[in-house]
């Protein structure tokens, strides 16, 4: 939601991208807060993802191949989204990042130069690059949402982890109030931590 509000005021242009972000922070009502929540929220999202992966490794969830592989694709998609989003406020990439990626691509025999021009939209990082990065950063979350639904769909094919294979119905407790309050508490703690970073 914060991204949608930011997109209303952002300009994907190398000359005015940084100025538009400064305008969001200074002139838009609570623009500084929206930008803060967007950036720090993304960082918290990654922390949650790493916890999720760690739990999956601990409980051997990689044995559910389809669910795990979709999760890996999800992680790559989220990382790609974060990468193209990181470029947007500055209106240019760090020269180091641009050089490394450009050199990697241009090293491909025969088609290297064409690859660089195809990805950047020119010989280097320029206006075309910024415009397509903005478009990708806006579109990828919808792809991520679709993949998340697939991730859950495959998880519900097998159910979550039950290595012994015994009937565990007797041990089950209702989702509400136990798990709903547990999730609500975690969400509240995360929200307080996020809000405290927004000063």
Swiss-Prot record:
Binds 2 heme b groups non-covalently. The keyword Electron transport applies. GO terms for molecular function: metal ion binding; ubiquinol-cytochrome-c reductase activity. Keywords: Electron transport, Heme, Iron, Membrane, Metal-binding, Mitochondrion, Mitochondrion inner membrane, Respiratory chain, Transmembrane, Transmembrane helix, Transport, Ubiquinone. Heme b b566 binds at residues 52, 151. PROSITE patterns: CYTB_CTER (PS51003), CYTB_NTER (PS51002). One of its GO terms (cellular component) is mitochondrial inner membrane. The chain crosses the membrane at residues 1-8, 32-53, 68-88, 133-153, 181-199. It holds the Pfam family Cytochrome_B. GO terms for biological process: mitochondrial electron transport, ubiquinol to cytochrome c. It is found in: Mitochondrion inner membrane. Heme b b562 binds at residues 38, 137. Its cofactor is heme b. Its main location: mitochondrion. A ubiquinone binds at residue 156. It is a multi-pass membrane protein. Component of the ubiquinol-cytochrome c reductase complex (complex III or cytochrome b-c1 complex) that is part of the mitochondrial respiratory chain. The b-c1 complex mediates electron transfer from ubiquinol to cytochrome c. Contributes to the generation of a proton gradient across the mitochondrial membrane that is then used for ATP synthesis. Belongs to the cytochrome b family. The cytochrome bc1 complex contains 3 respiratory subunits (MT-CYB, CYC1 and UQCRFS1), 2 core proteins (UQCRC1 and UQCRC2) and probably 6 low-molecular weight proteins. Heme 1 (or BL or b562) is low-potential and absorbs at about 562 nm, and heme 2 (or BH or b566) is high-potential and absorbs at about 566 nm. This is Cytochrome b. The gene is mt-cyb.
């Amino acid at each position: 939601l914060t991204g949608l509000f930011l997109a209303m005021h952002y300009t994907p242009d190398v000359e005015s991208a940084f100025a538009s972000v400064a305008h969001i922070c200074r002139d838009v009502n609570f623009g500084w807060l929206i930008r803060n929540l967007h950036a720090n929220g993304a960082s918290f999202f990654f922390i949650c993802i790493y916890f999720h992966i760690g739990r999956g490794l601990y409980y051997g969830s990689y044995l559910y191949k389809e669910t795990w592989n979709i999760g890996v694709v999800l992680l790559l998609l989220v990382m790609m989204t974060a990468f193209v989003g990181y470029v947007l406020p500055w209106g240019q990439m760090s020269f180091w990042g641009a050089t490394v990626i450009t050199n990697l691509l241009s090293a491909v025999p025969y088609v290297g130069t064409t690859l660089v021009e195809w990805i950047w939209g020119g010989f280097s990082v320029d206006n075309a690059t910024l415009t397509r990065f903005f478009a990708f950063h806006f579109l990828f979350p919808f792809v991520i949402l679709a993949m998340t639904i697939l991730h859950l769909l495959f998880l519900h094919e097998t159910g979550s982890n039950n290595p012994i294979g015994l009937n565990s119905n007797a041990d089950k407790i209702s989702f509400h109030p136990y798990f709903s309050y547990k999730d609500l508490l975690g969400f509240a703690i995360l929200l307080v931590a996020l809000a405290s970073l927004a000063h």
